C-alpha cells in the first residue's frame, strides 16, 4: 500500500554547526531512512585540557545506525569531513559520495585510522545525481569556496527538493576557472524549492566577498619587497590560496620548502587532481633550501591559527629543529583567525616579531579574503532559489539571526523561517515547518587515547584550577592504621602550614575509623568482611570536606588505601591494594591533639614522614601502591 506523503514528514536534524563555528553535521530522515550530510569537527578551547578534537554528540545515529543509507559530502574542509573517521568506529556508513579532492583527503584519514573498510568512497562530478535508499536522490551543484571542488546540494525527497548551500561565496573570477553553477540553482528555483538551508558565516558583512583573485596583487607586492627569507602560512586546505603562493614563488624565483604534514598532503592531492599546476623543480626539501641564498627561499607552512603543534607555532617558540627566525625574515599570515583562535595567533605573531621577523598580517593588508558569502550574495541565492521554507545554518547565533532577517526582507514569511539549535528535530511537511523535538546534542571530546568523558574532563579542570592532594593510608582488618599516612600536595596554594594540614588529615582519618568503622564491616561464620570500596568513598568525601574548609579551595583529593586483608579480586576497588602484614609496622591509634600555639605539638612517631610540595616523592610504606583518580562529581558544560 502506497504511503501518503501528505501526512508524512521529512525530518532534518542538525547535530553540529549551529550557534558555533565547526562540527557541521546534518541528518535527513524520511520513512525509516537516514541520509547524513557532512560530519565535521571543531578544535578544542583552552579549557579542554588534553583534548585534540571536538565532535558532535552522535548518540542519535548510534541508536539508529540501521537506518543509515549513506552520506554526502559538500567539500573537503575539516569542519565538514574531519569527524568521519571517528564516527566509523561507532557505526557503519554504507557509502559516502563527495568531490574528488574531498574523497582523496578523506581516504587518507580513513586509511590512517584503519577505517577504510567500514565504508565505500565514491567521487562525483558536477550535476551528477546519486540515489541513497528509496527516499533520497541528491544532485551535486558546483559552487565557489576557498577550497577547490566544492558543492551545494539539491536533495530530492518525496515531499519536494531541499537545497543545502554548502559553504559558499559567489566568486565571479575564480582561480580555477570553475564558476558557481547559478544556472542550475535558478532552474531549481523555477521548479520550486521546498526548503533552503544556507551558510550564514558572513551574514553580518555588507556587500560582496572579494574574489580570491583580489589577493594576488597584494601578495605579489609582499614578495617583491621581501629581501630575505620569506615564510608564508595559510590554511592547508585553501587550495586556491596555495596555488597563488606557488605561482608567485615561481615568478619571483624562489624555491619552495613545504613544512607541515597537512600542507604536504593537500598539495600532493591537489597536484595529482590538477587543481595546482607547477613544475616539480619548484619544490626543494627544507634541508636543501637552507643552502640557498635567503632571497631564493620560500617556506610554506601550517600554523596560521596558532595551533600548538603546527610548524609556525613551533618556529615562533624557537622549538623547530631546522628553522630559526633571524633578522630580515618576512613572515606572512595569509589567513584571518577563526573565532576562538585570536589570542593564539596574536601570541604567535608577537613571538615572531620579538625575534626580529617582519610579520605581515591583518585585514588591512589585503592578503586574505573569506571563502564565505556576504549579504548581497545571500540575497542573490535567496532570489534564485525562492524557497518556501528557510533554515539558516553554519554560524554563530547573531549570524543566523541576521540571515533570517534577510530572508524575511526577500519575502519569506517569518512563520516559514526557523532558527534552530543543534539537536532540534525540524519537521517539514508540504505546508508547514516546525521544531518537533530534540535529540542528544552535546559534544564528544577526543584525545590521543579516544573519547574523553565528562567526568574525566571535570577532573582535569579541577586539577588545573586547584591542584591535587593525595593521601596514602594503610589499614589493618580491624580498622587501625598500620603506618602514619603520607600526604602529597601538587599545584595547591597552601593557606596553612603543610605540617598542620597533614595533622588535620590524620586526625580526620582516625576519627572516621573510630566513629564509623562498624558501618563498613559485617561478620559471617565467625569472620569479618570489610566493604573497602564504600569505606574508601566515604573517607575520601570526609577528606574533601576538610581540605576545602581549611584551604578555601577545592583541589582534587585522591585517597589510596592499603590493607593487610586478603580480598577477592572482584571485591578490590581500583584504589585499594593489599600489603603483607610484615610490610608495615602497625601504628597505635592515637588522637592528634592540636593546640593554638604556632607549632602544634603531637606525640612523635618514629616512622612519620612529612611530605610537602617542595619535596620529591617519599618512598611508599609498602611495595604495592595503586593510584587512581577520584570520581568526585563536578558540574560542567561538557557532555559526553
Curated annotation (Swiss-Prot):
InterPro entries: Metallo-B-lactamas (IPR001279), RibonucZ/Hydroxyglut_hydro (IPR036866), RMMBL (IPR011108), RNase_J (IPR004613), RNase_J_2 (IPR042173), RNase_J_b_CASP (IPR055132), RNase_J_bac (IPR030854), RNase_J_C (IPR041636). Residues 598-610 have a biased composition (Basic and acidic residues). Transmembrane segments: none annotated. Zn(2+) 2 binds at residues 79-80, 167, 394. GO terms for cellular component: cytoplasm. It comes from the Bacteria. An RNase that has 5'-3' exonuclease and possibly endoonuclease activity. Involved in maturation of rRNA and in some organisms also mRNA maturation and/or decay. Belongs to the metallo-beta-lactamase superfamily. RNA-metabolizing metallo-beta-lactamase-like family. Bacterial RNase J subfamily. PANTHER family: RIBONUCLEASE J. This is Ribonuclease J.
Amino acid at each position: 500500500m502506497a504511503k501518503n506523503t501528505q501526512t508524512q514528514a521529512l525530518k532534518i536534524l542538525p547535530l553540529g554547526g549551529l550557534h558555533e563555528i565547526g562540527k557541521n553535521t546534518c541528518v535527513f530522515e524520511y520513512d525509516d531512512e537516514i541520509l547524513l550530510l557532512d560530519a565535521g569537527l571543531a578544535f578544542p578551547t583552552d579549557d579542554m585540557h588534553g583534548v585534540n578534537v571536538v565532535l558532535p554528540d552522535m548518540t542519535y545515529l548510534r541508536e539508529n545506525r540501521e537506518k543509515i543509507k549513506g552520506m554526502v559530502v559538500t567539500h573537503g574542509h575539516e569542519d565538514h569531513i574531519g569527524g568521519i573517521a571517528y564516527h566509523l568506529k561507532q557505526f557503519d556508513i554504507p557509502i559516502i559520495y563527495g568531490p574528488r579532492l574531498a574523497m582523496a583527503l578523506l581516504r587518507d584519514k580513513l586509511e590512517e585510522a584503519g577505517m577504510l573498510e567500514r565504508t565505500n568512497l565514491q567521487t562525483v562530478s558536477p550535476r551528477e545525481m546519486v540515489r541513497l535508499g528509496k527516499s533520497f536522490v541528491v544532485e551535486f551543484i558546483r559552487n565557489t569556496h576557498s577550497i577547490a571542488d566544492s558543492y551545494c546540494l539539491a536533495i530530492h525527497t518525496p515531499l519536494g527538493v531541499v537545497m543545502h548551500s554548502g559553504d559558499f561565496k559567489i566568486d565571479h573570477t575564480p582561480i580555477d576557472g570553475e564558476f558557481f553553477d547559478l544556472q542550475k540553482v535558478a532552474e531549481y528555483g523555477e521548479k520550486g524549492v521546498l526548503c533552503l538551508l544556507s551558510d550564514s558565516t558572513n551574514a553580518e558583512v555588507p556587500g560582496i566577498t572579494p574574489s580570491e583573485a583580489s589577493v594576488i596583487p597584494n601578495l605579489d607586492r609582499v614578495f617583491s619587497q621581501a629581501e630575505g627569507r620569506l615564510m608564508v602560512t595559510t590554511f592547508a586546505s585553501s587550495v586556491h590560496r596555495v596555488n597563488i603562493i606557488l605561482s608567485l614563488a615561481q615568478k619571483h624565483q624562489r624555491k619552495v620548502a613545504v613544512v607541515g604534514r597537512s600542507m604536504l598532503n593537500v598539495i600532493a592531492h591537489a597536484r595529482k587532481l590538477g587543481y595546482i599546476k607547477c613544475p616539480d623543480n619548484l619544490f626543494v626539501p627544507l634541508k636543501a633550501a637552507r643552502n640557498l641564498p635567503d632571497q631564493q627561499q620560500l617556506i610554506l607552512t601550517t600554523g596560521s591559527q596558532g595551533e600548538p603543534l603546527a610548524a609556525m607555532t613551533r618556529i615562533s617558540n624557537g622549538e623547530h629543529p631546522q628553522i630559526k627566525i633571524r633578522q630580515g625574515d618576512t613572515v606572512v599570515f595569509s589567513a584571518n583567525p577563526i573565532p576562538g583562535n585570536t589570542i593564539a595567533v596574536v601570541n604567535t605573531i608577537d613571538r615572531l616579531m620579538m625575534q626580529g621577523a617582519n610579520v605581515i598580517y591583518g585585514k588591512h593588508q589585503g592578503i586574505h579574503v573569506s571563502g564565505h558569502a556576504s549579504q548581497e550574495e545571500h540575497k542573490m541565492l535567496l532570489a534564485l532559489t525562492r524557497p518556501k521554507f528557510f533554515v539558516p545554518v553554519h554560524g554563530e547565533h547573531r549570524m543566523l539571526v541576521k540571515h533570517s532577517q534577510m530572508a524575511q526582507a526577500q519575502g519569506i514569511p517569518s512563520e516559514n523561517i526557523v532558527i534552530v539549535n543543534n539537536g532540534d528535530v525540524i519537521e517539514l511537511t508540504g505546508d508547514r515547518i516546525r521544531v518537533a523535538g530534540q535529540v542528544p546534542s552535546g559534544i564528544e571530546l577526543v584525545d590521543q587515547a579516544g573519547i574523553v568523558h565528562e567526568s574525566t574532563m571535570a577532573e582535569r579542570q579541577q586539577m588545573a584550577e586547584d591542584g591535587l592532594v593525595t593521601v596514602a593510608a594503610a589499614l589493618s582488618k580491624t580498622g587501625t592504621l598500620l603506618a602514619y599516612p603520607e600526604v602529597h600536595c601538587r599545584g595547591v596554594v597552601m593557606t596553612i602550614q603543610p605540617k598542620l594540614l597533614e595533622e588535620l588529615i590524620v586526625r580526620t582519618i582516625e576519627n572516621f575509623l573510630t566513629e564509623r568503622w562498624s558501618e563498613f564491616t559485617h561478620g559471617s561464620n565467625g569472620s569479618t568482611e570489610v566493604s573497602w570500596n564504600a569505606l574508601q568513598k566515604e573517607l575520601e568525601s570526609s577528606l574533601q570536606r576538610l581540605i576545602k574548609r581549611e584551604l578555601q579551595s577545592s583541589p582534587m583529593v585522591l585517597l589510596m588505601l592499603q590493607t593487610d586483608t586478603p580480598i577477592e579480586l572482584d571485591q578490590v576497588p581500583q584504589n585499594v591494594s593489599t600489603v603483607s602484614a610484615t610490610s608495615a609496622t602497625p601504628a597505635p591509634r592515637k588522637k592528634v591533639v592540636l593546640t593554638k600555639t604556632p607549632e602544634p605539638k603531637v606525640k612523635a612517631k618514629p616512622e612519620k614522614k612529612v611530605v610537602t610540595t617542595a619535596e620529591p616523592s617519599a618512598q611508599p610504606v609498602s611495595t604495592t601502591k595503586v593510584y587512581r583518580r577520584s570520581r568526585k562529581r563536578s558540574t560542567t558544560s561538557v557532555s559526553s
